[in-house]
Amino acid sequence: MSDSSPTINFINFNQTGTCISLGTSKGFKIFNCEPFGKFYSEDSGGYAIVEMLFSTSLLALVGIGDQPALSPRRLRIINTKKHSIICEVTFPTSILSVKMNKSRLVVLLQEQIYIYDINTMRLLHTIETNPNPRGLMAMSPSVANSYLVYPSPPKVINSEIKAHATTNNITLSVGGNTETSFKRDQQDAGHSDISDLDQYSSFTKRDDADPTSSNGGNSSIIKNGDVIVFNLETLQPTMVIEAHKGEIAAMAISFDGTLMATASDKGTIIRVFDIETGDKIYQFRRGTYATRIYSISFSEDSQYLAVTGSSKTVHIFKLGHSMSNNKLDSDDSNMEEAAADDSSLDTTSIDALSDEENPTRLAREPYVDASRKTMGRMIRYSSQKLSRRAARTLGQIFPIKVTSLLESSRHFASLKLPVETNSHVMTISSIGSPIDIDTSEYPELFETGNSASTESYHEPVMKMVPIRVVSSDGYLYNFVMDPERGGDCLILSQYSILMD
């Protein structure tokens, strides 16, 4: 085997963010995050998907096709503790994504979704979808609120089906009691169930009808950024949420299965919805300029939301006061995003607009890392303060539909990866539970020369929130965030996940 470094094909955290699964051109590895260390690996060929089920010994594996046993159409479920294969399932086309919780296993192909009972690996249901080449879907880790969300393609919908409307009147064909034959190479899994879904095609397939036509007096509209919410227990779609104007780039479901976060392909606006009602309860603004969003992740307590993108900066948003007291009509959603994408106004959160009325907020300014002080950041920080005053003044003058443009909260904290190269680096992140940090162990971090920061960090032990980031160039970065002040996250350590 060559001594050259393997190519990374897949990286992900487990559902709790405590482990990392890595698939390379040479094999796969499983790492523990704290303390950091490798606890399982195999050098058996190239792997495209390596998914964990929490911290159990169960792994879902998909190869890259460099050898017959590792076909990209074959899903292999293994037990790492017993070094045994639990089952194998071969699908008609390449597998793009696999998600699991303790009740369900979901396999996404480009035009189909297969849902299995994870305890028996019995095929429960098959969904026909429009092409989903990015393999976008998100699944709730919770069994109590077990949901699957995936993007709905651009389609023509009669106006009687409004945004956030339930779709219980839409009939789904549910896979019967057909047992799936495992360890098979030629038979297509669930093939007999796919033909039964033609009646469902109007909901999941692109509608070729003329968008200007009408049906029974009902006007038609085109939706491009819709998300389908699917209940994995009842095996029924529950809702279509109009998340964005443009194409969906990333999505995530909170640990308890109650919230869904989405980002569009422009990457300027992040929205959070109540997955039960479809109400938009948070809207965050990542930045002014468009960027490619790679991942969205909730903290386990749903207090924070981390967003990674092509800018090599990770933004953390705080889920505090929702927008429920100032809800917007569904028509306002498009107006907000269009303005947010084109506007150069650097807005801030509603809570931050009342600095003068909240002296405790002024006393606890966001922490600023001295090593990241640049002229651009200083100008931006100054403009944010001016924007707060401007937004507060304008909010008293303009009606709700105009002031809604100012309501997108900006990030609570951020971190910049210490990557000097300009090469393309993809990242994913995970937010951990608060931990105690002994400041004496990191004197170079907590004695920055900033008088305000030094005064606040004189405490010997501080409560901090860990932020873990894994990059496609093979590094794990451990940061910590001040849960009270936010600002710049501090890097504690970094490890290579490619070196043995």
Curated annotation (Swiss-Prot):
Subcellular location: Preautophagosomal structure membrane; Vacuole membrane; Endosome membrane
Described function: Phosphoinositide binding protein that plays a key role in cytoplasm to vacuole transport (Cvt) vesicle formation, pexophagy and starvation-induced autophagy. Component of the PI(3,5)P2 regulatory complex that regulates both the synthesis and turnover of phosphatidylinositol 3,5-bisphosphate (PtdIns(3,5)P2). Involved in correct ATG9 trafficking to the pre-autophagosomal structure. With ATG2, protects ATG8 from ATG4-mediated cleavage. May negatively regulate FAB1 activity by sequestering or masking VAC7 from FAB1. Plays an important role in osmotically-induced vacuole fragmentation.
Highest rank taxon of the organism: Eukaryota
Name recorded for this polypeptide: Autophagy-related protein 18
InterPro entries named in the record: PROPPIN (IPR048720), WD40/YVTN_repeat-like_dom_sf (IPR015943), WD40_repeat_dom_sf (IPR036322), WD40_rpt (IPR001680)
Principal cellular location given in the protein's record: membrane
Keyword line: Autophagy, Endosome, Membrane, Phosphoprotein, Protein transport, Repeat, Transport, Vacuole, WD repeat
Biological-process GO terms, alphabetical: 1-phosphatidyl-1D-myo-inositol 3,5-bisphosphate metabolic process; autophagosome assembly; autophagy of mitochondrion; cytoplasm to vacuole targeting by the Cvt pathway; glycophagy; late endosome to vacuole transport; macroautophagy; nucleophagy
GO MF annotation terms: phosphatidylinositol-3,5-bisphosphate binding; phosphatidylinositol-3-phosphate binding; phosphatidylinositol-4-phosphate binding; protein-macromolecule adaptor activity; ubiquitin binding
Variant or mutagenesis effect after changing T268A: Impairs membrane-association
Biased composition (Acidic residues): 331-344
Motif annotated as L/FRRG motif, chain positions: 284-288
Pfam family of the protein (one): PROPPIN
Positions of modified residues (Phosphoserine): S354
WD repeat intervals: 243-283, 288-327
Membrane topology: Peripheral membrane protein
GO CC entries: cell periphery; cytosol; endosome; endosome membrane; fungal-type vacuole membrane; PAS complex; phagophore; phagophore assembly site
Resulting phenotype, R286A: Impairs membrane-association
Assembly notes: Component of the PI(3,5)P2 regulatory complex, composed of ATG18, FIG4, FAB1, VAC14 and VAC7. VAC14 nucleates the assembly of the complex and serves as a scaffold. Interacts with ATG2, the ATG2-ATG18 complex being essential for autophagosome formation. Interacts with ATG9. Also interacts with VAC17.
SMART domains: WD40 (SM00320)
Composition skew (Basic and acidic residues), residue ranges: 181-194
Effect of S311A: Impairs membrane-association
Family indicated by similarity: Belongs to the WD repeat PROPPIN family.
Domain observations: The 377 first amino acids might form a beta-propeller domain involved in specific binding to phosphatidylinositol 3,5-bisphosphate (PIP2), leading to the association of the protein to the membrane. Association to the membrane can also occur through binding to phosphatidylinositol 3-monophosphate (PI3P).
Ranges for region Disordered: 174-197, 328-358
Misc: Present with 1560 molecules/cell in log phase SD medium.
